[in-house]
Curated annotation (Swiss-Prot):
Family to which this protein belongs: Belongs to the complex I NDUFC2 subunit family.
Transmembrane segments: 57-76
Record keyword Transmembrane present: yes
InterPro entries: NDUC2
Record's subcellular location: Mitochondrion inner membrane
Species this protein is from: Bos taurus
Post-translational modification: There is a minor unacetylated form of subunit B14.5b.
Cellular component GO terms, alphabetical: mitochondrial inner membrane; mitochondrion; respiratory chain complex I
Protein name per Swiss-Prot or TrEMBL: NADH dehydrogenase [ubiquinone] 1 subunit C2
Modified residues (N-acetylmethionine): M1
Chief location category: mitochondrion
Subunit (UniProt): Complex I is composed of 45 different subunits. Interacts with TMEM242.
Keyword annotations from UniProtKB, A to Z: Acetylation, Electron transport, Membrane, Mitochondrion, Mitochondrion inner membrane, Respiratory chain, Transmembrane, Transmembrane helix, Transport
Protein role: Accessory subunit of the mitochondrial membrane respiratory chain NADH dehydrogenase (Complex I), that is believed not to be involved in catalysis but required for the complex assembly. Complex I functions in the transfer of electrons from NADH to the respiratory chain. The immediate electron acceptor for the enzyme is believed to be ubiquinone.
């Protein structure tokens, strides 16, 4: 039976190692987008229940926005953690297998670009 990566706890949304990562910024555009989705879901809820779409239930729309941003914040935190785990595994593999990843010789910009001749 496949158990996945060693040391990985199953069915755990945010492990304790995720606390060492910096939290997502509250000004992240992805959070604003998720909040906008919450606002739109409040509008759709009003439209389905045949209420005035923009004016009815402003408190409900605010509740949708805050709950969507709250859930989105933890989803972003999980996404950042998963990317950090992937990067850690990838860099440790590169470090332990240097023969598969040879150092490339560094070129200067003069070697990369062609010589410039202005046309007048």
């Amino acid at each position: 039976m496949m158990t996945g990566r060693q040391g990985r706890a199953t069915f755990q949304f945010l492990p304790d190692e995720a606390r060492s990562l910096p939290p997502p910024k509250l000004t992240d555009p992805r959070l604003a987008f998720v909040g906008f989705l919450g606002y739109c879901s409040g509008l759709i809820d009003n439209a389905i229940r045949r209420r005035p779409v923009l004016l009815a239930g402003l408190h409900r729309q605010l509740l949708y926005i805050t709950s969507f941003v709250f859930v989105g914040y933890y989803l972003l935190k999980r996404q950042d953690y998963m990317y950090a785990v992937r990067d850690h595994d990838m860099f440790s593999y590169i470090k332990s297998h240097p023969e598969d990843f040879p150092e490339k010789d560094k070129k200067t910009y003069g070697e990369v670009f062609e010589e410039f001749h202005p046309v007048r």
